[in-house]
Every structure is written in structure tokens, then in C-alpha cells.
């Protein structure tokens, strides 16, 4: 069986000399002993061989029922699903969408898609119809696997988009194929003789994962089979083989889908947690003696401050991997007091980078997000001149990585905006690195609000509020919050200074139009006028400062 699990190994970040003699580009090269992912092996072939080699290994445990799922069972169901897809005429490039909660078969259509050389597109089951319609337009799926709760919304969205994708339901829904039924028609001989499709693993798109756009609607980020294979290196990097794991993240996020696949690559026992709640998470860690937990930093911070980690015995945790936001020094200290011997790896990542770009493998400088992982380079650009800056100088952070996305799905313009001609990805984040190569984030040049691990675009909420007849002007910004990172707050100017528009009215208006994760959790503030720039744009920094004074 081919191995790529040591492509990320400990080593030394260095600064590369530029023409003027200064060392301005951070890079962490591959270790000489690293095993580079093999050519001509797809992620589907790699996972298929792992599952086939250990049929009795318990790969999944349902935390609700204690039921166990072996690699052999996972392989059979995923092969049966792949055979069904082939019987329906699936081809390379076809999209298999997934819209469901976490359960044994959440990963099955993804594995089947990888075997067939097609493209898997996980969607958030909490999306409303407008959001799913947007995903349909981006990914243009040929097949959609969804749970019973999402079926009606998915069917309406497909119909309104004039998309005739076949819908398969985990459970039952009138007019749709049942997942249990599509597994039945195939013989043991067909399963034994199954082979994965041969593809070009460097160019074929394996995943379309959502990333927030400046309008609030997500973009479809394309990643190849090669990206998945390289990300499997985290098993070696963090010594995760044969761990008992829990992925407290939806497959909608890059961390969730990569985390689930990494669990298979590392021969782990993954405990499935259908609902991410602080008390449930801590109870699962205690009951199943979880040794590796992967979660967004928003979940981690809520766990720390909820008291759940003290309520349950979580001493089994050897490694916690978190990303997607900042963990304050206060929160980190509380976590370290609870788990003094655990390896806490917090890092910086982007969906467009295929996951993590940095990791703190040791206690780095305070507030640092760590150093570039292997094969990743970083430079800081002056936001005015575009020139490369040195250590301690603040500018836009740019990245080069073997895991950088192929592009945004059906969106070459925005792809060209974020990846330049030399292959550098412009993150939109503002920061610097110190003399030791540790990277610090100081601001976001984007206006996105980060709340509970979700990216919320002010423009989307502002567009909804502005449609209220009693609203003359509005702006939405994030208010810093110890638990949620930020909470969206709407600043509203009433039309004609009318007093008839209430906070509850605005909050309910937004709630009726967007998903639960985009609510105005910070409330509404009424002003006589918004502070604006000479061009008429809201001065968001001024509004944020007003909120800071409330803290």
C-alpha cells in the first residue's frame, strides 16, 4: 500500500534571501526523509486500500447508540454506493453533493465519489433554500445525498434552479431513492471485483468545499486528490496513528471533511457526535477516552469557558487540534491548567489553502499562530506598494502551498483576484512574522465577521435590513466576544428619525431571512447618522470603537 504519511515532519523554518540580501520570504521545506505522496495514486485508491487491508478494524463508533462500524462494513457500503453511481452513468467531473448531519454514512458518498473519480461537494444541512440554491448554481450536482430533514428544501432548490439531479435520502422521502435501497442490487462478486477509476490525481477535482465570499454567499473551493494526499501527512506530524478521535466539525468545513478522511488514513477509531454541544463533547471525551480531538477554535473556546472540561474526566486527551480563529491568552491558560501534558496545536488556515498553513507544535510566542508547516512559504506585502516586507513589518499575508486550491468553482475572475501570476495566494489578512519565523495576525482587511466559527458578511445582513421601510441607513460590524469571537451588531438610522422601528423588529427581520448562524447576536444600535468616509462608505472602525467602549 502506498504511503504518504510522513510528508509533514518536524524541521526548521528559514528565511530566503531576496536580491537585496534581505531575508524576507519564510519557507519550511520538506524534510529530506519525508515520503512525498506517490504519483498516479488517487485519494480514492489510497483510502480503498486502507479499508480493504483491515476489515475488522473499528473505524466508527456512534456516540448515541455505541454501535460500531468496521472498515470492512465501511468499504462494502461505499463500494455499493460507487457501483450505484456507475450504474447511473457517473463520469469524471460529475458532482456528488452531500447535505446531512453526522452519522455512519455521512462519509459514504464522499468515499464513493473518490473511488469513481468524481467530485464530492459537502453542504451545510442547516442552510435555507436560498443558500442551497446558491450551492446548486455553483456546483451543478448530478446527485445529492441528504437527510430527511433537508430533503424538502433540497428538492425545492433543485426545481427552482432547473437542476434534475437524482436525490438519495438517508431514511425515506416521497419521490426520492432511499439510501438503504440503492445498496441492495449488487452481488458479492461485483463488490469483490470492484476497482477504483484511474484519474490524474494532480488535476482532477476531488472536493468542492465552501468558503465565505465578500457578498456573504459562499464560493466553491476546488481541491484535487493531491491536496487530500498531502494533508494525510498530519498523521505523521502529530503522531496520530491508531488514536481514538472525535471530529467536532461539520463536513461543510474543510477541517471537517479533511479530518474525517485523515481518521481513516491514520487507522483511527472515530467517535461520531451528531450534535456539537459543550456538555456532549466533554462527555464523549470522557466516555470513549478520546486521545485526539479536532475542532474549530470557536468550539474550543466555548468548551473552555463552559466548565464542561472540569465537569468530566478529559485527561485521556493527548492532542487537541484547533483552527479558524484566535484563542486568547486567558483561554489558553485555562486549557493548559486543565490539560498540562496535552499537545495543543493551534494554527492558521484557509479553505483555499486546503486546511492548515501553520501549526504551534510547541509553546510558541504568545499570540502567535505558529510557523509554516512543511512545504509552505509565507511573505508579507506592503498594502500600499506591494513590496515585500521583512520581520516585524505589518502587511498582507500571502502564502504558497502544495495544497493551494485549484480555483473557485466556475469563478475564474475571483480565482485570479486571490492567486497571482506567481502562484501566491493573497489571504486578505494583515499580520507580520518575528525574527524566529512565528506569524502573528493583527487584523483582517476583509470585513467578514467571525462568530462561532462562521464567516458572516456584513453586506448580506445590511441588504436585508435596508429593505425595511423604516430604515434609512445601516451597517453591520462585529462586537468582540470572549466566547463567540465576535457577535454581529447592526447600527441603524431610522427613516425620518421614526421611533416606530424597534430592535426586536430588526432582529426578527434578519432571523426570517438567514440561517441560525447569521443572526444578529449582538443586537441593534440606533444612531441619528452613520459615520461615513468621503466616498460615503460606513467607517466600520469608528463603529467598532463604539462597541469596544461597551465592553
PLM regions and their residue ranges:
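Conserved pre-ATP/AMP-binding loop-to-beta segment of ANL
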Residues: 55-56, 102, 169, 174, ...
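Gly/Ser/Thr-rich phosphate-binding loop
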Residues: 265, 290-295, 304-366, 377
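Conserved AMP-binding/adenylate-forming core of the ANL superfamily
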Residues: 58-103, 107-111, 128-133, 137
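AMP-binding/adenylate-forming catalytic core of the ANL superfamily
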Residues: 127, 144-146, 293, 401, ...
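Structural core segment of the AMP-binding/adenylate-forming
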Residues: 2-16, 87-88, 115-185, 496-499
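AMP-binding/adenylate-forming catalytic domain of the ANL superfamily
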Residues: 170, 515-537
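Conserved AMP-binding/adenylation subdomain of ANL enzymes
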Residues: 229-244, 252-292, 306
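Conserved AMP-binding A3 loop
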Residues: 68-72, 206-232
